[in-house]
């Protein structure tokens, strides 16, 4: 029984460290100058605004690794959710949100 517990604990630590080392995790500056935090959640990553008028609101959920991610992003002002993608390039997070994969908008957020 103790051996199973030890193995489970080691696997949990390895899984948590894999997410901790992912380049997407951290604080990013939005185009409006607010702080957005990206952290591991539910087997993927969540984007939560930490400052500004929508502070505390989760605005995105993404899955992926090695600098390429896909998921959903929410415009907090319009409260509309879009298909999105994220890509890390150095200390920049390039985001794209699309309606029907036809009409897309992009933003680039620098790492803080």
Show which residues each predicted segment covers.
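Sec-dependent signal peptide recognition
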Residues: 1-8
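Sec/Tat signal peptide C-region and signal peptidase I cleavage site
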Residues: 14-21
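Central antiparallel beta-sheet cores of small beta-barrel/beta-sandwich binding domains
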Residues: 22-85
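Short, exposed beta-strand-loop hairpins at the edges of beta-sheets
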Residues: 83-106
């Amino acid at each position: 029984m103790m051996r199973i517990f030890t193995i489970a604990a080691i696997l949990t630590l390895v899984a948590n460290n894999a997410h901790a080392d992912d380049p997407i995790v951290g604080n990013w500056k939005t185009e409006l100058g607010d702080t957005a935090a990206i952290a591991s959640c539910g087997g993927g990553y969540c984007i939560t605004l930490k400052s500004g008028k929508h502070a505390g609101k989760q605005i995105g959920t993404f899955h992926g690794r090695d600098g390429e991610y896909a998921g959903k992003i929410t415009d907090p002002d319009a409260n509309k959710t879009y298909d999105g993608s994220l890509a890390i390039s150095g200390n920049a997070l390039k985001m794209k949100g699309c309606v029907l994969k036809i009409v897309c908008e992009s933003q680039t957020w620098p790492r803080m």
